[in-house]
C-alpha cells in the first residue's frame, strides 16, 4: 500500500472517463499521486467510477466493488469510495448491501470526496485537466443529462435533464489542453445536437464546433452521439467547411421499422431517417457515419428485423455497433412491455446484423487500398505502429497498422499509403 496514492478505476463510457480525469486533477492539486485503471492496485485510496447503463455493466461494477472490498478487508487498501452512474441510481441499496465501502457518491457530487478527506472545501479544477488517454487526444464533455425519453433507456433517469456547459468554459478547457500538447478532441454528450437548448431554446452546436475549430493548435475534432430528430443541418456546413473537423458523425439510430421506432419513442419515421442519411451523404461527401442499433426490443417481429437488415445493406454505414435489448427497471419499456423476444433469438439477430455489417465494413476499408490518408500515431505495439485516420475514433473503430521499419513519433501526423486491409483494420506505409 502506497501512502498518498489514489487509484481510480473507471467503468463504462468516455463521459465517465472525463469525470475520473477531473477527479484525478483535483486529487493531484491537493498533493496526492494518482493512477488510473492500474493492473495492480497499490494506492491507500481507491475510487471506483461505476456504470449503471445495462445489466452487464451494473454487474461488472458490482463485481469490481466486491473485489476491492476483499482487498480492503485484507489490509491492501485503506479507503474505498464509489461514484458514478450506479451509485447515483442505487446509492441506498448499495449502502445497505455493501456497507464496507467508506462512502458512496453519485455522478455529480464527487468533488465532495476531497472535502470528506479534509481537503479544500470547494476544490476547483484549474489548469489543464489530467488526461488518461494518450497525450495527443482528449474527450470533451459539452453537456450533462438528456431530455430524450427513449422507452428503453435508463440514462435520463440516472443523469437527469440536459444541462449545457457554458461555451467559454468549454473553449477555455480546450485551450488549456492544447497548451499541454493535445491535438485531437472527441466532442461528447448524451445528445450532442441538443447543446444550447436549455440556455435559450436554440441549438448552438454548429457555432460551438466552429469556435473550437478556430482555436490555434486544434488539429482534429470528432463528433459523437447526435440524434436524427430535429438535427441542426447547419452543423453539416461546419463539418464540410472546417478542415480540422473530421468528416465523421456518430448518430445512434437504434432501428428503422416504423413499428419499432414508435414503440421505442424515437419520434422519427423510417422515411425521415432515410431522407436524413441521404442528405448527410449529399451535403458532406466522404463523411463516415457511425451508428448503433438495438435488436430484440419487445414486440420486434421477424419482419421488423428483416427490415432492419435491409436498411443496413442500403445505408452502408462505415461504422456500426449493435446490442441486444436488456430490460432496465424504471424505463417505459420495462413498465409497459413484456420482454417477449427470447434470449437466443436476440443473440441470433445480433450475430446476423453484425455479420452483415462486417462484410460492408470490409468492402469499405478495402476500397481505401492505394489511397494516401493522413494518420495520427497512437502507440507502438511489437513490430507495428498503430494509428488512426480522421474516419476512426479511438477504441471503437478500425486502426492503421504501419510496419515499424523507421522511427515514428506517437502523436504525430503522417501521410500513409494504404497497402492492404482485412475485416477490421488497414495496413500502410509512410510516404
Located regions from the model:
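Radical SAM/AdoMet-radical enzyme domain recognition
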Residues: 179, 206, 214-215, 220, ...
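Proteins enriched for Cys/Gly/acidic motifs involved in redox and nucleic-acid/cofactor modification
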Residues: 1-195, 234, 245, 249, ...
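Conserved glycine-rich "GG(E/T)P / GGGxP" loop and the immediately following alpha-helix
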Residues: 52-57, 182-211, 215, 227-234, ...
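Conserved, mostly hydrophobic/aromatic
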Residues: 150, 170, 187, 223, ...
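Terminal RNA-binding accessory module
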Residues: 333-431
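Conserved strand-turn element in the central/C-terminal portion of the radical SAM core barrel
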Residues: 11, 149, 153-160, 220-229, ...
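Short, electropositive alpha-helical surface patch
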Residues: 200-213, 233-247, 300-318, 342-348, ...
Amino acid at each position: 500500500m502506497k501512502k498518498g496514492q489514489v487509484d481510480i478505476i473507471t467503468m463504462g463510457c468516455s463521459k465517465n472517463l472525463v469525470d475520473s480525469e477531473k477527479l484525478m486533477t483535483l486529487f493531484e492539486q491537493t498533493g496526492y499521486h494518482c493512477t488510473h485503471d492500474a493492473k495492480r492496485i497499490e494506492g491507500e485510496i481507491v475510487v471506483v467510477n461505476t456504470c449503471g447503463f445495462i445489466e452487464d455493466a451494473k454487474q461488472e461494477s458490482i463485481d469490481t466493488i466486491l473485489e476491492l472490498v476483499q482487498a480492503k478487508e485484507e489490509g491492501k487498501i485503506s479507503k474505498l469510495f464509489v461514484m458514478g452512474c450506479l451509485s447515483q441510481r442505487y446509492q441506498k441499496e448499495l449502502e445497505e448491501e455493501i456497507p464496507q465501502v467508506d462512502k458512496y457518491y453519485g455522478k455529480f457530487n464527487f468533488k465532495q470526496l476531497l472535502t470528506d478527506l479534509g481537503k479544500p472545501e470547494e476544490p476547483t479544477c484549474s489548469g489543464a485537466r489530467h488526461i488518461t488517454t494518450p497525450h495527443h487526444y482528449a474527450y470533451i464533455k459539452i453537456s450533462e443529462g438528456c431530455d430524450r425519453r427513449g422507452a428503453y433507456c435508463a440514462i435520463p433517469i440516472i443523469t437527469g435533464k440536459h444541462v449545457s456547459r457554458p461555451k467559454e468554459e468549454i473553449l477555455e478547457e480546450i485551450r488549456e489542453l492544447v497548451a499541454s500538447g493535445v491535438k485531437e478532441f472527441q466532442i461528447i454528450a448524451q445528445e450532442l445536437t441538443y447543446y444550447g437548448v436549455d440556455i435559450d431554446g436554440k441549438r448552438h452546436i454548429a457555432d460551438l464546433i466552429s469556435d473550437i475549430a478556430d482555436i490555434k493548435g486544434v488539429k482534429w475534432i470528432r463528433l459523437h452521439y447526435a440524434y436524427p430528430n430535429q438535427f441542426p443541418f447547419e452543423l453539416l456546413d461546419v463539418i464540410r467547411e472546417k478542415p480540422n473537423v473530421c468528416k465523421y458523425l456518430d448518430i445512434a439510430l437504434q432501428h428503422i421499422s416504423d413499428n419499432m421506432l414508435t414503440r421505442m419513442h424515437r419520434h422519427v419515421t423510417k422515411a425521415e431517417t432515410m431522407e436524413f442519411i441521404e442528405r448527410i451523404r449529399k451535403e458532406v461527401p466522404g463523411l463516415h457515419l457511425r451508428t448503433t442499433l438495438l435488436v430484440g426490443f419487445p414486440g420486434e417481429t421477424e419482419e421488423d428485423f428483416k427490415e432492419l437488415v435491409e436498411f443496413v445493406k442500403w445505408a452502408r454505414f462505415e461504422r456500426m455497433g449493435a446490442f441486444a435489448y436488456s430490460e432496465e427497471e424504471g424505463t417505459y419499456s420495462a413498465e409497459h412491455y413484456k420482454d417477449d423476444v427470447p434470449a437466443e433469438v436476440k443473440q441470433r439477430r445480433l450475430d446476423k446484423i453484425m455479420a452483415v455489417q462486417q462484410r460492408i465494413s470490409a468492402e469499405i476499408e478495402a476500397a481505401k487500398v492505394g489511397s494516401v490518408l493522413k494518420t495520427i500515431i497512437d502507440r507502438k505495439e511489437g513490430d507495428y505502429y498503430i494509428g488512426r485516420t480522421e474516419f476512426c475514433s479511438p477504441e471503437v473503430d478500425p486502426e492503421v497498422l504501419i510496419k515499424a521499419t523507421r522511427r515514428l513519433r506517437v502523436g504525430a501526423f503522417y501521410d500513409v499509403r494504404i497497402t492492404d486491409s482485412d475485416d477490421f483494420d488497414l495496413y500502410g506505409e509512410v510516404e
